[in-house]
Amino acid sequence: MDHAGDAMRTDLMTITRYVLNEQSKRPESRGDFTILLSHIVLGCKFVCSAVNKAGLAKLIGLAGETNIQGEEQKKLDVLSNEVFVKALTSSGRTCILVSEEDEEATFIEPSLRGKYCVVFDPLDGSSNIDCGVSIGTIFGIYMVKDFETATLEDVLQPGKNMVAAGYCMYGSSCTLVLSTGSGVNGFTLDPSLGEYILTHPDIKIPNKGKIYSVNEGNAKNWDGPTTKYVEKCKFPTDGSSPKSLRYIGSMVADVHRTLLYGGIFLYPGDKKSPNGKLRVLYEVFPMSFLMEQAGGQAFTGKQRALDLIPTKIHERSPVFLGSYDDVEDIKALYAAQEKTA
């Protein structure tokens, strides 16, 4: 079979070329999305460089301010947020930005507006910077009907309305995972070229995995279905092997491993935090979008995660996401609890 003419050759496919290829499949496209994405990619490159130099540049210490979530901000958080706000604003393709670091949504001035809303966590897992654990940027993109009259309602949409979502992981390599609604692809930054190259084409999560990922330190406060599920992972009664526990504590790293190897990532609600800790718009939705596009599932304990309609920009929700069959197992436990309630 001759692959010479294959437009999807992974050794040559940059993220820019990939997005242009996708654009050519949509006759109605005017290139706005491509321009927006190129600005997100630029932001990721900048943050990747800053993360790599953090120790040398003395960026690691606390900036002395506290963000809307009550977390002490790291200097890198502040820098990353500024980078993405500026990159997205200067694209001329956005009208509303929602960042994990900012209390209010940012409405772009009319002369610079475009038809997209971007929700993002500029540096997820930043408490892990000091010890060298992988951290990352998470983003989701919505399209609005009329950017001139855009309101907060244009952002408070269910995740299924997103037109694209992705994350960039800053670890042993800089990896950008993206879905524009037709599958999931992974790109790795080649430092010598300064380009993201397609290294993981058409990612599909295995139907069932051997790994579960959860903070078991919260186990005493879990609800019944979560407790039963984790018990089943550790002590299966059907003769299967126990699942392995892998938990990094950086959502991007834990979800990335789950996406590639299969299994399930759990961040349940508990007695202390009934709605869990993860934010709906810029953590739960983008990761759920990617999981579904890769053939997996995402569930809140009550419904499909992408069907959730947020009422506040920093709203939180429990989430169970990963391999299709593994999420089915936890859904069955919640359904059984509903019947007995």
UniProtKB/Swiss-Prot annotation:
Its cofactor is Mg(2+). Mg(2+) 3 binds at residues 121, 124, 283. CDD domains: FBPase (cd00354). Substrate binds at residues 124-127, 215, 247, 267, 277. Mg(2+) 2 binds at residues 100, 121, 123. The keyword Protease does not apply. Its EC number is 3.1.3.11. One of its GO terms (biological process) is fructose 6-phosphate metabolic process. Binds 3 Mg(2+) ions per subunit. InterPro entries: FBPase_C_dom (IPR044015), FBPase_class-1 (IPR000146), FBPase_N (IPR033391), FBPtase (IPR028343), Fructose_bisphosphatase_AS (IPR020548). Keywords: Carbohydrate metabolism, Cytoplasm, Hydrolase, Magnesium, Metal-binding. Mg(2+) 1 binds at residues 71, 100. It holds the Pfam family FBPase. GO terms for cellular component: cytoplasm; cytosol. It is found in: Cytoplasm. One of its GO terms (molecular function) is fructose 1,6-bisphosphate 1-phosphatase activity. It catalyses: beta-D-fructose 1,6-bisphosphate + H2O = beta-D-fructose 6-phosphate + phosphate. In plants there are two FBPase isozymes: one in the cytosol and the other in the chloroplast. Belongs to the FBPase class 1 family. PANTHER family: FRUCTOSE-1,6-BISPHOSPHATASE, CYTOSOLIC (PTHR11556:SF41), FRUCTOSE-1,6-BISPHOSPHATASE-RELATED (PTHR11556). This is Fructose-1,6-bisphosphatase, cytosolic. It comes from Spinacia oleracea (Spinach).
